[in-house]
Amino acid sequence: MKSVKLYFSLLLSAVMLVVAAPVMAQDESAVAGEQNVEQTAEVAAPEAEAEAVMPIAEVEEGAKAAHAPISSEGRPNEDIDKEFSVGKAIGDFAGQSAIVAFFKDGGWKNALMLIISFVLLYLAIVKKFEPLLLMPIAFGMLLTNLPGAGLFHSELFAGGHVHWEDFALGSGVGLLDYLYLGVKLGIYPCLIFVGVGAMTDFGPLIANPKSLLLGAAAQIGIFVTFIGALALGFNYWEAGSIGIIGGADGPTAIYLTSKLAPHLLPAIAVAAYSYMALVPVIQPPIMKALTTDKERKIEMKQLRTVSQREKIIFPIAITVVIAILLPSAAPLIGCLMLGNLMKECGVTERLSKTVQNELMNIVTIFLGISVGATATADAFLNWNTLGILTLGIVAFSFGSASGVILAKIMNLFSKEKINPLIGSAGVSAVPMAARVSQTVGQQANPGNFLLMHAMGPNVAGVIGSAVAAGILLAFLPL
């Protein structure tokens, strides 16, 4: 019983101390404050006598401020007495929304770009025009043209350079600005090439080395269009970026354009992937116009079997030779051959599958949405875009025709005849161009099987477009 009484007495004492502590602290602070005021008054008295008397207006303003309502933050708040207006609140909300931006100067451009993005989404989803990349590009275009979203800021990359000081500050930098760094620094296209290499079989090219010439011939369209773009008033860097469309290689076009003419990137990317999707429409008329029915019926012998040793040596040898002769092409060629070596060596199957699937898919999403983000109204809605689309199809047509013409020339000196249709597969739209050669060949001769023969020039075109990009980078100073 005594212990219980002792416990309650101690508890009561503790409560009294807790209650009294703030009061004691206030008393001590008040005493200290009075001492400080007295000391301050003694020091400031001589100075106050020298100063003029406070104007009456300032005294009245101070009195008003003293009697003003106090906000929750302890500061005078004159607006707290004002009656809340629902109409004003709705007006303020509408002014902050993006709807108003469509009715301001230049707002119609954003609306038009949104319509273009809807059209591209339709082509990708319904018509299946290169949907794996055209759909992310279209959605990136949609995001960047939503007024007020602030996801992409082209001024951070003005002049073709990354303004790292703005990124360091972090304020005003959107999500797509960070993702676009992968395009600007050339990371995404190279990673795409690793995946392409892991999915490519160079066996038909190794079995028939002459098909390398057909792949090289198809790149003539790049340089013909380069000259044509110069004639139309584009500068050297812009002409080089436009010409690469003729290679029908999206990652290469994006890689080169991001280096030479980044302001043309959205138009060139859309043109490149659109024309790749239109290979079955563009190529057959050209192939039929340049060949006779007899030439289209030519049957080619079955290719020899290529050993695993040859498939392992090939990517290593190609990397060494091209990197020494043309260092500017080393990033693309090196990544392409790295992926192929993973596939062919037989000891990195897990890496090969990861590169072909997970890595390829993730990078494709980032690449597409980043490229689409650059398609702002100012960058896309101009006469240059129309010129790029026109020159792009010219480049693609010249590339397809050049391969067919070289195959016809080779038949003049070769004992074993080559079906000229496989020459059009020299553009690097893998494997669509090879399938078109097979389809047109079977229309003339149902028993003709050209697919594997056409795959030789087709994969050679992948190497050729990367080499052509390296040549342009070497001759055009950044």
Task: Show which residues each predicted segment covers.
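Low-complexity, proline/glycine-enriched hydrophobic segments characteristic of transmembrane helices
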Residues: V4-Y7, M16-G106, S154-V173
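Hydrophobic transmembrane alpha-helices of secondary-active transporters
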Residues: L120, L143, Y180-I206, N340-M342, ...
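Alpha-helical membrane segments and immediately flanking helix-loop junctions
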Residues: K184-L185, F193-M199, L214-V224, G228, ...
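Alpha-helical transmembrane segments
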Residues: H263-V281, L391-G399, I422
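Membrane-embedded hairpin module used as a gating/binding unit in multi-pass transport
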Residues: S274-V347
